[in-house]
Amino acid sequence: MKIAILSRNSKLYSTRRLIEAGRKRGHTVRILDPLRCYMRIAADGFSLHYKGKPITGFDAVIPRIGASVTRYGTAVLRQLEFMGTYTPNPSDAILRSRDKLRAHQLLAAQGIDMPVTVFGDNPDDTQDLLSMLGPPPHVVKLNEGAQGAGVILTEKASASRGVVEALRGLYANFIVQEFIGEAEGADLRCFVVGDKVVAAMRRQAAEGDFRSNLHLGGTAAVAEATEQEQEVAVRSARALGLAVAGVDLIRSRRGPLVLEVNSTPGLEGVEGVCGVDVAAAIVVHLEQSVRRSAG
């Protein structure tokens, strides 16, 4: 099988592991910087070039598209899709996952529970908007933030209003959510491949913080996701159209709540903590999916 990996940096851990896993299973693997890809779109067909040469014959493509190049990267991925290349995470699914508001709407439509979320545009509605959420603490999130950036905890109603008004002044899109205190700064990252959770880890926020992201100083340990948590994680990925996803849950009194569905989850943390060859699981999924589509 001929596999392309859309990545701007071949030295990143996740990219290197996917290369290793693909080649170990006998496949040809090539890294394509999405920003060096360019395309021709016409009624008579789609074509893609890379550094002066046409790109053809790929059976599968693994998108590792950073948030800063989402628009162009997904356009390149979409071109490959139209050219008949299989991808576990289609371009439209990535776009759904990176718009927090849209993602939460889609999850809620499938009956998947999450922290109560509110969204509004007009400053005149701020007080009523926050009253729909209930008393603070509140969590304010940039709609397209990643890795814990643009996430603010407000402990007073006046602080919530101030942050909301400041973000509106910057023309930033954001959502506001209820704060789940019983989670105590911990979440569960479930790594979904296909129709199952292949690994799970519990992440704990650093002292004085409520964000559990590892690169912000959080710690992680291997975890055993319950059957309910695994079901919620798989349903969440499926609701957005993703076959490979990092689904972040928190454990609450009313059950698992989905915080986010990440379409480009890093492998380093989960492989290091859990000792699971997630990269190989992704490649096996590609093999099975391409075989079925050829079938």
From Swiss-Prot:
Cofactor(s) needed by this chain: Mg(2+); Mn(2+)
Residues binding Mn(2+) 1: 248, 260
Entry note: cofactor: Binds 2 magnesium or manganese ions per subunit.
EC number per UniProt: 6.3.2.-
Binding site for Mg(2+) 1: 248, 260
Keyword set, alphabetical order: ATP-binding, Ligase, Magnesium, Manganese, Metal-binding, Nucleotide-binding, Protein biosynthesis
InterPro entries linked: ATP-grasp, ATP-grasp_RimK-type, ATP_grasp_subdomain_1, RimK, Rimk_N, Rp_bS6_RimK/Lys_biosynth_LsyX
Domain of life: Bacteria
Binding site for ATP: 141, 178-179, 187, 211-213
Positions with a binding annotation for Mn(2+) 2: 260, 262
Domain ATP-grasp span(s) in chain numbering: 104-287
GO molecular function ontology, one term from the record: ATP binding
Name of the protein in its database record: Probable alpha-L-glutamate ligase
Originating species: Xanthomonas axonopodis pv. citri (strain 306)
Name of encoding gene: rimK
